[in-house]
């Protein structure tokens, strides 16, 4: 690795850590409690955010929770007592909002992971986890990268990558909190991992 690439890696790690440090602890705990208290959890996201949501669904399954990915054929219907967790980093996405509306009408609660807590989708949600990171909507494509999106600087990472990397870290932190809430162990989680690989 060149010195320039190593410097970019350090900058990216600082940015991701900065996002995690700015999480609202109370909102994080409410989000964890909502997940642990749900009868069934359905998860949805688009693009690379969708990949993070699939990884999170897998970890929730490892915790023994009834977690499913929206769009998969094995997804049961949602209703009262269930939770739809959606990712909408840039804010209002029409397809995500439509799914949230369907879930709400069926009696399920809606939880939103976003960088835009003031969006209509977030305002209508039962739970919001604000990840304060650059998304595609914030990326101005500048070449002079900075580490603080609050000052209008562009992340060293392209497009929405800062949000996506921070999202994965936040989800793993939620898994650790949920492990405490559910009384699961590393061993019990490993025991639920597939043997077909």
Predicted features along the sequence, with ranges:
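A short, charged, Gly/Pro-tolerant segment at domain boundaries
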Residues: 1, 173, 179-197
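Generic N-terminal amphipathic, Lys/Arg-enriched alpha-helix
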Residues: 1-21
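Hydrophobic packing residues in well-ordered alpha-helices of helical domains and bundles
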Residues: 5, 9, 28-31, 53
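Alpha-helical scaffold segments in soluble metabolic enzymes
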Residues: 11, 18, 30, 165, ...
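A short, well-structured juxtamembrane/interface segment
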Residues: 20-37
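Glycine-rich phosphate-binding loops that contact phosphosugars or nucleotide phosphates
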Residues: 42-168
